[in-house]
Structures are given as structure tokens and as C-alpha cells.
Regions:
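Short, low-complexity, polar/charged sequence segments that are solvent-exposed and flexible
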Residues: 1, 24-28, 87-91, 141-145, ...
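Conserved, well-structured core segments that form the ligand-binding/active-site neighborhood
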Residues: 1-117
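Flexible, glycine/charged-enriched surface loops at secondary-structure junctions
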Residues: 8, 72, 119-126, 252
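Fold-independent oxyanion-binding glycine-rich loops
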Residues: 10, 72-74, 126-127, 140-142, ...
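A broadly tuned preference for mixed-charge, low-complexity surface segments
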Residues: 23-44, 114-136, 193-196, 225-248
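Intrinsically disordered or highly flexible coil/loop and linker segments, enriched in small
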Residues: 63-66, 121-122, 248-252
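C-terminal catalytic subdomain
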Residues: 95-199
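Extended hydrophobic packing segments that form well-structured cores
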Residues: 164-252
Length: 252
């Protein structure tokens, strides 16, 4: 695929994180909070830590000239006491493809989708699946703010710490895609309609209900991993032609 991967030691992130002072990020934190619809569980101290982490990662992006990255999120939480959700949100808004939990397949999918469509994407878990109605709910604790109509500053769902982003997304046509397989030679591709932003207490912060145009049983039967990638708009034909032309097998 022509993509070069490189491992970056988390110790380098910690080093830069510890060099950045609270005063250096205070203005940026206030500016972001002022744009939010609301700030809920998270404290000002949580916001400062999360912004320091963003600045540390951004420094590495610039030094290494990265086009995309994925974080070892839970190790970061253990070492810094904050989450990478805000950093990933801001990086995606800046055109740096940024994904969660060390998921290289999903970040590759996001990168390919951005190159082909010019659109940023939402990386999420299928957190509720109704095969009878062909509806799914996709949820995650981060999304690029530019993809939202409004956003709420929350904490991270699983750990109840740090910063999470609850995005309120526009309704309408969406495309869901995932590249997988050992050689990135398989893919799932489906379209649907985003009908609702939900607010369940037992899911990650950004939640969207999607009425799928194809059977939702795929997500229960044998999905290509957990994370899937959502784009606003219908790009099924474009993505299918690209992946088929590169010898990939479509999984239904």
C-alpha cells in the first residue's frame, strides 16, 4: 500500500508532556471550553492535562512529519493521568489522521478514506446492534470537533477520567468502512442514514444511531474487528472501486 509505519516510544511523549507547563496551555483550554455547548464531569485540571498531552503529541507529529498516528491510549492514562481523546480530536481537525488504542487497521482505513474523499472520519465501536431493524449505534469518546454541529466536554467513559468529547453530529447519509485481514486485503463497506444522536449512560460519549441499508448482522456475525470508520456522505462506489482495483475482498 506504500504506507510506512514507525514505532514511537511513549517515553518520548512523556518527556515532552512533562516539559509543557500549565500556563502554556491555559489560553487554549479557555478558548476550547468557550466553544463547547457544556462542560460536564471534567475539571479545569483535566482539561489542562489533556491539552498538554495534545501539545506533546503535536510536537512529535511535526518533528517526525507524520501523516497519521494511533495511540496506546490506556498506557498513556496510566502514566499521565489523562486521556488522549482531546489530542486525537484536535489532531484530526488539523488534518492529521489520529486513531485510538493502537488500531493500525482502522487508522489505515481513515487515511485511505481521507485521501480518496477529502473527508475526516469517525472511528467508533458498534455498541448496539439491532439485526431486526438494521440499526446500529456507533460510539467513541473522541471525534474531530469540525465534524460536529455542537460538542460537550465530558470525561472518558471507561475510566471516568481525563477528557472525552461528546459530539452532536448532523443527520443524513453516512458510509461505514473498515479495511482488515492480515495483509489489509479484506474490507467491509456499507451505507446508511444517521438518524439520531443518542445519550446512553453505558456507552462512550459520542453516540450515533444509524439505519443501515445492508443487513446489520455483519456486526454480530464476523466483523473485521471492533472499530469501524464512519464518513458523512455516501462514498460506497468510490471506495468500492478503489479497494476492488487493489485486489481486496469485500466482506458482507
Amino acid at each position: 500500500w506504500g504506507v510506512e509505519y514507525t514505532d514511537i516510544a511513549l517515553e518520548r511523549v512523556y518527556e515532552y508532556y512533562n516539559q509543557i507547563t500549565d500556563d502554556e496551555v491555559g489560553e487554549a483550554c479557555a478558548g476550547l471550553a468557550g466553544k463547547a455547548l457544556a462542560c460536564r464531569e471534567a475539571s479545569p485540571e483535566d482539561m489542562i492535562k489533556a491539552m498538554r498531552l495534545y501539545r506533546a503529541i503535536r510536537k512529535i507529529v511535526d518533528e517526525d512529519r507524520l501523516s497519521a498516528l494511533t495511540l496506546s491510549c490506556f498506557r498513556l492514562i496510566e502514566q499521565t493521568g489523562t486521556t488522549g481523546c482531546l489530542a486525537l480530536s484536535l489532531l484530526n481537525d488539523e488534518g492529521i489522521i489520529a486513531g485510538c488504542e493502537g488500531d493500525l487497521q482502522s487508522v489505515f482505513t481513515m487515511l485511505a478514506a481521507k485521501v480518496l474523499t477529502g473527508k475526516p472520519a469517525f472511528m467508533a465501536n458498534p455498541s448496539m446492534i439491532n439485526a431486526r431493524t438494521n440499526e446500529i449505534i456507533l460510539a467513541h469518546c473522541t471525534i474531530g470537533i469540525a465534524q460536529t454541529e455542537q460538542f460537550i466536554i465530558r470525561n472518558h467513559f471507561e475510566t471516568e477520567s481525563g477528557i472525552g468529547i461528546q459530539g452532536i453530529l448532523p443527520t443524513g447519509d453516512v458510509t461505514i468502512v473498515k479495511c482488515g485481514g492480515e495483509c489489509l486485503d479484506e474490507y467491509y463497506l456499507g451505507t446508511g442514514t444517521l438518524t439520531e444522536n443518542t445519550n446512553y449512560i453505558n456507552m462512550c460519549r459520542t453516540q450515533v444511531r444509524i439505519k443501515m441499508n445492508a443487513p446489520a448482522e455483519y456486526f454480530l456475525r464476523n466483523p473485521l474487528g471492533n472499530h469501524h470508520i464512519m464518513l458523512h456522505g455516501n462514498y460506497e462506489l468510490m471506495l468500492d472501486e478503489f479497494l476492488q482495483s487493489n485486489g481486496c475482498k469485500r466482506i458482507e
